[in-house]
Amino acid sequence: MSAVASLLRALALGLLAWLAIQALLFALVQSAPGGAAAALAGDFATRETQAEVTRSFALDRPVAEQFVSFIARMAQGDWGVSYYFRRPVAGLIAERLVPTLLLMLGSLSSAIVAGRALGLWAAAQQHRGAVIAAAASAVYALPVFWVGQLLMLGAGLELGWFPVSGLSDPRQVDAGAGAAALDIAWHAVLPVTTLALQHAAFFATVTHAKARLEMDQGYVRAARARGIAERTIVWGHVARNVGPQLAVVALNRLGMLFTGAVLVETLYAWPGLGRLLSAAILNRDHPVLLGAFGLIVAMVITSSVAADIVQAWLDPRIEPDRAPP
């Protein structure tokens, strides 16, 4: 199968997976206690009012028909109006997506840099490498919410080093672009560190394992035979071969990153997509739930397809839609 055909097949499978997940979520939302009519009219509305809302919003149609109509409107850019915020869902999600991407990209880049460095350093240690890798595995097992609470209490509330809530200080609005950017970066330190710590430990473990495999290869033995220092071999030759494989792993971590972002945003009152989802769940805001989850699922599937493509590029024997995770 050609590369283009494999790519088209992977995209088609990704679209089918997205539609299946959206259909399941739509059915769950429609069958939730209270229903959309109660969410729109209010819990204390009379039955007559709820019935009128049901007719006005065509909520009495079959669920399958409602889903097809929802997907058709979504494809045209009409994601509906939030029941709770009374604003277009697309604009609301776009507004909250920027802080979430800032949090995720900052955490992912920090985790890759720190995890790669720690993993390579552990691989270069003849006797202490296994201990370092075990410590990284232990850190990876720590709950994100618990780590966040420790950092908030210690570095935030007790020592006062960093702010513990929000995206920025309202007093910095008129301070200029540079000062505002620094203020956002300062507020992002604890949320980014909380989200990055677990992923850095994961990348360190993966890097250590892959680096140890690389160090058994012939080119490493040849370099040692030529008298090249172990540090140069690890940070020069081995690091170059491990790097592309980490890119595949990073793309496949996007789903876990979103899950952690929801917890971190809730903990630090970070005004992102995760906090919006929490509010939508509490307030039974069905349009926001469907739109936000749909976007997250689409991004996760896209990153998975991209990981398959990168994996196939690294190893041409693997087709993009059949690449291993």
How would you describe each model-predicted region?
Residues 17-68, 159-181:
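Hydrophobic alpha-helical transmembrane segments of membrane transport/permease proteins
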Residues 3, 7, 11, 53, ...:
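Hydrophobic alpha-helical segments of integral membrane proteins
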Residues 2-5, 21, 93-129, 144, ...:
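Alpha-helical transmembrane segments of integral membrane proteins
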Residues 2-24:
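Hydrophobic secretory-pathway targeting helix
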Residues 32, 139-142, 258:
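Transmembrane helix irregularities
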Residues 18, 22, 26-31, 145, ...:
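Membrane-embedded alpha-helical segments of multi-pass transporters/permeases
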Residues 60-116:
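An internal, D/E-rich "acidic patch" concept
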Residues 136-197:
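Generic hydrophobic transmembrane alpha-helix motif, especially the helices
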